[in-house]
Amino acid sequence: MISEAPPFWWRKADWRAWMLAPLSFVYGRVAGHRMAHARRASVSIPVICVGNFTVGGAGKTPTALTIARAAKAKGLKPGFLSRGYGGSLDVTTVVDPHHHRAVAVGDEPLLLAQEALTVISRRRVDGAHRLVAEGADLIIMDDGFQSARLAIDYALLVIDATRGLGNGHIVPAGPVRAPIGQQLRSATALLKVGGGQAADRIVRMAARAAKPYFTASLKVRGDDRLTGIRVLAFAGIADPAKFFRTVESRGAEITVAKTFGDHEHLSEDEIGDILTTAERQDLLIVTTSKDFVRLSGHHGKAQELAQQCRVIEVDMVFDDHLAPGLIIDRAIVACRERRLREMKTKS
């Protein structure tokens, strides 16, 4: 799966999108067929998948964290399941946030592991069974909606209200991962993040398909203001512009903005450039939680940068504060129904 979205994907379709359209047709046919017809393995506990329609960030990880907190408030033991993208380990592993580094397990799993039991696995079915063995009673998948490997009881698709579906084309002509119709049929509900209008069309399509949708927004954690402070902001995430807007919303003046690839581990030269630039211009360094965990556990310049960073942490806040609990309850009911169907089939 492509993880880096070229800029033209997020603009009106141009000659590049149309030139790649034949490849998109083939890719879409394969992806749609897999989602519709693949045999999915089953586990004995509820599975919630937090996915999205497109390649790139939409807020899946903050959403997964919010659902996990709601699960713990209900007395459940949630477990996160991640592929561990960006990490080097290719074996099923329980992530230890005090031992592992992002270079081994990926940045998002490290963030998830700070909240709840987290397993990474290139084979999601193996990872799900490991979570069951570790005592989890609810699995929250961070991504993996289109993989069609594991039976899902509740599929929540997150869509950014500012970016929407981009140019609307399927990979590689655009950011869409599979035919929208098939994705909607496989989804349980949508979560629209932010106040833009780019997601309105897909929300209307979901409504016609009788799919409920929730609304939410990313809120900066705490009351820390940066009013009037000149900063160097850097981000290696799918949508760095969103982070820069968040920094400015705190009152900061972004004097220098540096962007890197999603999940990218910075080189010594890149780190040195950030440190030197900030010192020369007397700038406060600010970054994202994901970028910070990629620096954690290292020595030398990476450690120095981590010590100097101000981390802007955000939470996914549902407009209806009862929504995360409702999602969990419906996943539990759906799991019971799935298990009953499986028992009848076996008998």
From Swiss-Prot:
Any Gene Ontology biological process: lipid A biosynthetic process
Entry EC no(s): 2.7.1.130
InterPro entries listed in its UniProt record: LpxK (IPR003758), P-loop_NTPase (IPR027417)
Chain sites annotated for binding ATP: T54, V55, G56, G57, A58, G59, K60, T61
Pathway involvement of the protein, from the record: Glycolipid biosynthesis; lipid IV(A) biosynthesis; lipid IV(A) from (3R)-3-hydroxytetradecanoyl-[acyl-carrier-protein] and UDP-N-acetyl-alpha-D-glucosamine: step 6/6
Record field: catalytic activity: a lipid A disaccharide + ATP = a lipid IVA + ADP + H(+)
A single GO molecular function term of this UniProt record: tetraacyldisaccharide 4'-kinase activity
Top-rank taxon: Bacteria
Gene Ontology cellular-component terms listed: plasma membrane
Record's keyword terms, sorted: ATP-binding, Kinase, Lipid A biosynthesis, Lipid biosynthesis, Lipid metabolism, Nucleotide-binding, Transferase
Function summary: Transfers the gamma-phosphate of ATP to the 4'-position of a tetraacyldisaccharide 1-phosphate intermediate (termed DS-1-P) to form tetraacyldisaccharide 1,4'-bis-phosphate (lipid IVA).
Family to which the UniProt record says this protein belongs: Belongs to the LpxK family.
Name assigned to this protein: Tetraacyldisaccharide 4'-kinase
Organism annotation: Rhizobium etli (strain CIAT 652)
Annotated gene: lpxK
